[in-house]
Amino acid sequence: MKNLVILTGAGMSAESGISTFRDAGGLWDRYPVEQVATPEGYQRDPALVINFYNERRKQLLDVTPNRGHELLAELEKNFRVTVVTQNIDNLHERAGSSHIIHLHGELTKVCSSRDPYNPHYIK
């Protein structure tokens, strides 16, 4: 069986209705990255950061994987597929893909950077 590595980014999720970060009118136009996507931003205003990501999680409830997600999952019938994605949603998983690497993490899986007993603890 052949191996396939597939790279995906914002366009894949945008087709499902997920807001992008960088496009005109995207999330970074409304929220400076320093305020909601850095440890310093969290230290300054944890409520803003938590609300920002909770809104992203809420958006996931209203969208479904698109045909592109489904086609990638179907490739697993004939290939060993690894999807490497910049997206932080779980649409690849929901479409049925089983080997996904989220380069920037995933909204539905969070961990504390302050919990030394957490296996994902960041020092």
Q: What are the functions of these language-model segments?
A:
Residues 1-123:
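Conserved catalytic core of sirtuin-type NAD+-dependent deacylases
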